[in-house]
Amino acid sequence: MRVFLRFKLYSGILFSILTSSPIMGQSEYKIFGHRGCRGVYPENTIEGFKKAIEFGVDGIELDVVVNKNQELVISHESYIDTSYCLTNKIDNESLNIYKMNISEIQDIDCGSKFVKEFPNQLKVKEKKPTYKEFKKELIDYQGDILFEIKCDYDLVNEYFPDYEKYAKIIFEETRFSRHFDNIYFMSFDYRILNELFKIMPNSKYIYLSSNKEFEKQMKLLNFEPFGVGIDFNIISQKIIDLVHNKKQVIYGWTINDEENSKSLTSMGLDGVITDYPNIIKK
């Protein structure tokens, strides 16, 4: 009997030590391919998303803007960025996606140009896809989608639709999608999240910030979001604990080296958003 009690005592102590350690006690985290996997393939493209999925990501991150025909276009910028797209035009005004139809947008090659930031990125002719094309090409995809909505209050009606119209476009293009339940709507602009929440109160929302004062910014939201996405450079144990105490998740962007990934996930970071899902592994 004494042996059995002693065994139970030792087992309990061992279990307590193991589960209280930073690594054994942390919850499972997720890895997301940033704009697909732009470290190795042109960003925000159908093939880029497929490559990220091949690398085994838990989810993919993409960005959306709106074109002249009120369609969602997958693009990080609201204009054709000449730093990675091939065009003779140099002014953003003439390359404003909000004033271009889809054929004009997709006539421009956004994959063949050398990108200094990503020297190993495959150079191949690519186009900016619509969200409708994404839904069709990845219809069987069942992972998470970090759906970043690009917006800027100072550029509304010039580069972006007004918030109410923007929210309705997003609602119409996503609500019947097979991916809908896996979408996390994200933005740096609290206004578009508030507008979306009015018509999709049961969806998941993530507030994005690159500011340590993100808590103050979040007070402008009319609801409690599912979580926050923060520049990894300002994430600390204190910030992770603060977010977790609110029963929210915290994702870090953009983490491209294993050292930072391991360090932050050992603190309890819930998600790693990376350009290199071929390198950053669990």
Walk through the language-model features, giving the residues of each:
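Bacterial Sec-dependent N-terminal signal peptides
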Residues: 1-28
